[in-house]
Amino acid sequence: MDSRDWTQLGCVAYPSPIHPDYHAGPASTIAFDNQDELLWIGTQKGFAGSFIGRELKRFTAFRIHPETDGPLRQFLFVDKGVIFLGSRSVYMAARSGVPIWSIRHESMQDLRAMSFTSKGTSEILVAGWQNKMLVIDVNKGEVVKELPTQDQYSFLKMSRYICAATNKGTVNILDPITFTIKKQWQAHGAFINDLDTSNDFIVTCGGSHRQTHNTPAILDPYVKVFDLKNMSAMNPVPFAPLAAHVRMHPRMLTTAIVVNQAGQIHVTDLLNPSNSQVCYTQPQGVVLHFDVSRTGEGKALADNKHNTYVWGSPNKIQFTEIGIPPRLPDPPQPSLLPPDPDMLEELPLSRIGLPYYREQLFSALPPDIISDVGAPPQQIDPNILSTLTKTDWGYIGPNKTGLQRNQYMDTRSTMKTSNTIRAPKFLSEKARESQTGSEDNTLATNETAMMTPNNDHWSLRPEAPPEYRICEIKYSKFGVDDFDFGFFNNTPYPGLENNITNSYANSLLQVMHYTPLLRNMALQHAATACLADPCLLCELGYVFDMLQKGEGPSCHATNMLRALNHTSNASVSGVLEDIAKDKNPSTLVKNLTMFLFDKISQDYKGTPPISTELERTLFKLNQPPNPLDLVKRLLETDARYQIKCMHCQHVSPRTATTFVNKLCYPAAKPNIRGMKAQRITFSQVLKAGLENEAVNKGYCTKCQRYQNLDQRKIIFNIPAVLALCTEITTAEHRKLWSTPGWLPEEIGIIVDQGHVYCYEGDDLKLHLNRGIHNITVYSLVGTVVNVETKSPQKSHLVATVNVGRAEPESKDQDRWHLFNDFSVRGISKVEALTFNAAWKMPVVVMFQVKAANHRFNMDWKTRLDTSVLFRDNNPHALKTYELLDRETEIPGPDTVIAIDTEFIRLKEREIHIDEDGKSKTIRPISHAIARASVVRGQGSREGVAFIDDYIHIKETIVDYLTEWSGITPTDLDPINSQRNLVSPKTAYKKLWVLVNLGCKFLGHGLSQDFRVINIQVPRNQVIDTSIIFMKPPSQRKISLAFLAWYLLKEDIQQNTHDSIEDAQTALKLYRKYEEFMANGSFHDVLEALYKKGKTLNFKPPRISTGAAKDAGFGAVHRVGTPPVPAPGTTEGSFEISNSSTATTGGSALSATGGMGSASASSSMPSTPVRKPIGLGGPFTVAGVVKPSPATSLDNFGAGAVGTGITTAAATMGGGYGGYGTDGAYWGGPNDMAPTSMIGGSAFIPAKFPPGPPETRGFIPYRPQVLLAEREAAAAAAAAAAAAAANNDVGGRGGVACGNGGAGGEQGKQE
């Protein structure tokens, strides 16, 4: 970070001299926006203003609160807007100034600071110089909690904890969940003037009294530093000019920026304070406020003279990562009428009279008159442009349009009529009609015609037929899943959906997929341990694997196309349709072909493939080849340019390795009367393109001047995959391609002494029969075709592919298909190879060596690299999972795993509104996976998660969907997240490996999960509980929450969704299903389930509702996934035994102590799950417990099973060690813990330990017990208390309870 080139880039006076707050004082606070290129400034009387970019151009200004409330204190930024803090109110508004909510509360007396909490941007904590703190729900705009406090706070900043600066110079560390003080430091003697935090550090500036408290405090000549990780103070950083303000650099984690009141800026490394840089600013007054932008490139200072300055490097500065300025309002349109002095602004329009009239007004147009004002101008046909001659004033040429001079065309008539295939009915509509028997067969004829082979050559028609035109996806209220893709494809070859950005690549992906060498290359690489992100070769392998496994009519390449956005040089290569200068589909796909072949060759060289058996056999190699040599043989045209000066005959060589070759057409020769025009063949054009001989102007090093240079390419090797760009630019080129049979199915190439010879047709057969030369035969795999349509319809790309090349050897090798995105149908060879100069021209042609047809190497499936499943990508993250054991837990075809995912929203849906006001969805809402959890489905650790990945999203996130996903911005922040944050590639690779190992995926509503993950799982590997518990005639799928409530008596998804919990619940439902099938009661249970669901509208009643109480249900729920215990410890493990023990042989529950998690011997997960409580049955009394006199509270709860007693009134188990839930218990000999049991499944304590359970470092349970049960248990406890009075009952180890439980029996014996 170099501060030497910093300079003042902008300055603004706010409040300005004309502002009503000018005389009240200078700015009260400043802050950089974290999303838009804005700097916000607050005033002393409650105004806020925002300014754009380095020039500080005025954007918005509006009042936040009345001037009697005093100055504006602080800004906080969220996706939807800005939160403003005043002394007596909290206000939220959009960045444009539109208010969202405002809160005034009786407890708001003198607020000074606010901060986000553990729930991310959905909740804030506000505090000040008052005795109460308040928690505010940002989404609802209401106070949800009031917290008393003994300290008065001036600053709040969120990092690992909430760091709070008091008005007495101390720094308090607050728990972000309970808001209790965990640590306190005395930072400065009198006051703290500024505070900031990073992930691990706190830095403060402040002042102290130099002699006595009666003397005024002055600023300290140092910056105090505290280590949050180790909870310790570090050596202060000296700052002789007296530190007034400090900020941590947002990108350089150990760098702080310190400013004094005169504007002197020091950039200091906290770990090496002697290494610092200094920058001198020239403020007009004393610096009152300072802030640094999110990128660290912009610095803002505000002085007491109403000026705010922006400093930074003039060559590189932007406030946010993206750097997009906010959208400005449209400027007002000037009035077309001259100003009228009589038209006063206060004059109502009703005072202006209208003349009397008897004839019809001119504005009353009859309905048959059409006004086409504003219609878009007609696009000029490219075919016409190619025939025009350029002049000094424009272009001139023959009029072939059939229209007269200056005659225009009704451009809207073509918009109203669409020559496309009529869209089918939605699947939901068909289902309703089939149930009612009113199915409409009007589309049956269309569908039959669509799928019945037609011998008519569509390519000979003057315009593109419907089969070649753009196919649009229609959306119902059920989204894209309701669209009938099967209507457009009844072949076994999946299409690709086109509702994704950059989906123009679909046609090229289909051609590459059916090129066996490219498919094998991608899959062999994807099966390696490659975790590079992005890696386009891996992404191609995943797409090809989806298309191979595809059992439906369509797939989508979302992940591949997203990875394209993040690949280096993609934006400058013209392959991203949103930002490409030339958006013509043919140009885009040509650029993409060259870009992809270059990138996948680099990726292939980086990691050796799993197997090279196919390549060794094909190229007759003895040893495993080097990846560099393989790339040359597979993709590279090995050549060298020979550049010869036409003047001095000097020859200079230059390497000319290419992956994609361009065809070169001979110059048109004038027709000579009486001579037959020479026929130009494809082989001649190919030879000219490979050798690329041309004469160009260039610099000759020998002549030392520009001369005509003869450039010729000497070829040494032609690759096995020959990708060609057609480079069709003139009408002559179109005429060539329109010649029937001009593109051959096979070509032969001979490379001899740097020369290339190409043959086709009879010439090829002749050379093959003679067998003199070493000729390589190439087969045509497919073409990418540009379908040109007249304006306003858009041109687009389709693919014609011979899928027979990529299938096992068969008699019928010519199996041509037309891939029009998700519309796929078989076509004849003649149709595939016929082109039309008017609308059908090829852009990319793909050949492959004939010897590689029908050849596959499936070794990658048996040699799949599985190391990603056993690698911990983030050892320091919060552990909510346990990795698989390499020795005992090897996934395979018999492995059942339960999966659930959580999503975030990347883009809102795009809507197109027609001129008649009708709207339709162009692109649906775009989601991305943010969390993926996979739990074991069998074995001794059934229900224990072994994958719990949070995904680092690189795109801009529109909505975290926290209410439904449980995902907060902090979870996905690579700097502040404590989660197991991984790249999208790593998370996807784990699931892809499990699919290809044959594991069975169990979950609820998996189709949506798989769609967002963008993975194809074969049907025989999917177990979907939403389908298992679906009554076929109803076609209604029941929610996971309702199934859990009804079948498992558990109330899940109380506060948010937790993917581990949902996966565990789906697993338990499947076990229930197996149980019902075993005893033959499944159909009866299903009937009762739907009957109960209809009465409750298939929504589970929550515990607080009367319906839940009437049903007799109780539940324990949690608010997140607690961490699993460290390996080798027994902390927090629960063991449930179903064997009969002790006197009456009931079920028993024992706890082996600890704090937090549970494991079960009978298929219960070690991650704590909600357990039913209050279901009736016999009552027992848990053992009386007390800690050992030598045991402190901190280490209480880690011993062996304690002692207990039993009486006729109740069974009393051993002591309960620690408190692993907030229902955990410790106490004296006379304390009783009543518990309601059913089958030994749960327990309830009678009292809680002092202090909130969150201070013990775990996520609490919230047990609820019916009042009647508590009273009954208390009565039983009283009877047992007398017998237990003289017994030292309890201990540190655990509790055992149940009818005749083991702990009670042990207590009896002792």
Swiss-Prot record:
Q: Where is this region: Linker?
A: 318-463
Q: Does the keyword Repeat apply?
A: yes
Query: Where do the WD repeat units fall?
Result: 22-61, 67-105, 106-144, 145-184
* The keyword Nuclease belongs to this UniProt entry's keyword annotation: yes
| Coiled-coil residue windows | none
- Which cofactors go with this protein? a divalent metal cation
Which annotated residues bind Zn(2+) 2?
A: C645, C648, C700, C703
**Reported regulation of activity:** Positively regulated by the regulatory subunit par-2/pan3.
The molecular function terms of the Gene Ontology recorded here are: metal ion binding; nucleic acid binding; poly(A)-specific ribonuclease activity
The UniProt record lists the Exonuclease domain at 897-1070
Q: Its catalytic activity?
A: Exonucleolytic cleavage of poly(A) to 5'-AMP
Cited function:
Catalytic subunit of the poly(A)-nuclease (PAN) deadenylation complex, one of two cytoplasmic mRNA deadenylases involved in mRNA turnover. PAN specifically shortens poly(A) tails of RNA and the activity is stimulated by poly(A)-binding protein pabp-1. PAN deadenylation is followed by rapid degradation of the shortened mRNA tails by the CCR4-NOT complex. Deadenylated mRNAs are then degraded by two alternative mechanisms, namely exosome-mediated 3'-5' exonucleolytic degradation, or deadenylation-dependent mRNA decaping and subsequent 5'-3' exonucleolytic degradation by rgb-30/xrn1.
Q: What is this protein called?
A: PAN2-PAN3 deadenylation complex catalytic subunit pan2
Q: Which organism is it from?
A: Neurospora crassa (strain ATCC 24698 / 74-OR23-1A / CBS 708.71 / DSM 1257 / FGSC 987)
